[in-house]
């Protein structure tokens, strides 16, 4: 596994004056207006502006067939891009990777890599598919566990046990097939397996949406009331689902933050607002920055500092935002002023290719002051 926290160059590496301008295409698996994927694309384009790379974004509107058609269209272009960035959402990227291999287009997988039979058949990057350069993902299993442990700690501190002496939690996952979802859900199960006083009453799936999460939460809460179970916490695999859970809990007469806790993931502005209000315990994340980090990997690769010198698989850590550290990154997310990030600072140093520090602390230290702010 590649390093996402190596040695950070004090000033990074600027793009050489004679370096080739890069053309990069990103096939966005999300919907227009879907906060997480919009932010991934925006950080890509902000990094591209700093690193002499033009980033074209094509949006598949959460339809894997559209995603494949867009990918096939890119690799069939007479004027091919230098790099094509894909996400293996719904495990649908393999046909595009294979078409890119045949066309000689270099690819990078972001957020979701190959799993199961695909991984077994194709092996690691650069083996069967020579033009598949690698992947950049986040350690979402640890994120899922951290979210669950925060719920458990809060419930224990408040003594929110049910009459059976157990802490009862609802789990809401996005889906059962996307690698990033599987990892988050596994983190929840790991944390609960280590906590004999905790029970996950239900693991329900809400297709990543607020409306479906609101419905499944309402159903769970009415079931819990009938069974005389005291619900202590709701673990949601992304922020929209956490917001749906908040709405359902409030409608059921509960007071999130006071007699039940909810956690989410995505660092979305709506979630930060709920944290500030004391209704949401935390949002894990920062993984939308994979967009910017992916451009750094490809710029370094193009300039002869191949990240595969460490590993073709780069893994970045996520972090939780709570009321304690909200001020440090809240403004960046609210304004989406990603041009404040000095992406050149994160480039690998010569002789240390593939070693990156993509931590939240490094991010905070790289930020320039907002325009109009005095020194």
Regions found by a protein language model. Name each.
Residues 20, 166-168, 172-173, 293-375:
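Hinge/cleft segment of the Venus flytrap/periplasmic-binding protein
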Residues 35-50, 143-147, 179-198, 216, ...:
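Short, solvent-exposed amphipathic alpha-helices that sit
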Residues 49-61, 171, 193-207, 257:
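Short beta-strand elements in bilobed, periplasmic/extracellular small-molecule ligand-binding domains
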Residues 61-119, 241-242:
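Beta-alpha junction/loop-to-helix N-cap segments that form part of ligand/metal-binding clefts
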Residues 67, 133-166, 213, 267, ...:
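Hydrophobic alpha-helical segments within soluble ligand-binding/sensing domains
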Residues 21-43, 47-48, 56-70, 86-91, ...:
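Extracytoplasmic "Venus flytrap"
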Residues 84-107, 188, 201-273:
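Hydrophobic alpha-helical
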Residues 98-142, 165, 271:
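Flexible loop/hinge segments that line or gate small-molecule binding clefts
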């Amino acid at each position: 596994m590649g390093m996402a926290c190596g040695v950070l160059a004090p000033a990074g590496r600027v793009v050489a004056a004679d370096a080739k301008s890069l053309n990069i295409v990103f096939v966005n698996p999300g919907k227009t207006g879907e906060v997480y994927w919009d932010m991934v694309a925006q950080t890509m384009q902000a990094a591209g502006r700093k690193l002499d790379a033009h980033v074209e974004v094509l949006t598949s509107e959460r339809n894997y067939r559209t995603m494949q058609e867009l990918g096939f269209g890119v690799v069939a272009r007479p004027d091919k891009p230098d790099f094509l960035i894909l996400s293996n959402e719904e495990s649908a990227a393999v046909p595009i990777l294979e078409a890119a291999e045949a066309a000689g287009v270099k690819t990078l997988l972001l957020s979701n890599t190959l799993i199961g039979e695909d991984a077994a058949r194709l092996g690691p990057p650069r083996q069967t598919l020579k033009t598949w350069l690698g992947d950049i993902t986040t350690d979402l299993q640890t994120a899922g566990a951290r979210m669950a442990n925060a719920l458990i700690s809060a419930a224990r501190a408040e003594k929110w046990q049910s009459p059976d002496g157990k802490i009862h939690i609802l789990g809401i996952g996005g889906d059962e097939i996307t690698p990033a979802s599987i990892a988050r859900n596994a983190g929840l199960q790991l944390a609960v397996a280590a906590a004999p006083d905790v029970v996950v009453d239900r693991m329900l799936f809400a297709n990543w949406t607020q409306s479906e999460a609101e419905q499944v939460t309402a159903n769970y809460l009415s079931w819990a009331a009938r069974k005389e179970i005291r619900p202590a916490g709701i673990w949601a695999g992304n922020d929209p689902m956490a917001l749906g859970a908040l709405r359902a809990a409030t409608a059921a007469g509960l007071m999130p933050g006071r007699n039940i806790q909810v956690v989410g993931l995505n660092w979305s502005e709506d979630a930060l607002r709920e944290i500030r209000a004391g209704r949401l315990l935390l949002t894990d994340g920062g993984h939308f920055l994979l967009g910017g980090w992916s451009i750094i990997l490809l710029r370094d690769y193009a300039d002869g500092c191949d990240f595969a010198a460490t590993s073709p698989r780069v893994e970045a850590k996520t972090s939780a935002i709570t009321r304690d550290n909200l001020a440090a990154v809240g403004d960046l997310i609210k304004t989406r002023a990603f041009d404040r990030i000095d992406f050149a600072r994160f480039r690998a140093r010569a002789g240390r290719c593939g070693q990156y520090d993509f931590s939240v602390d490094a991010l905070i230290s790289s930020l320039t002051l907002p325009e109009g702010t005095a020194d």
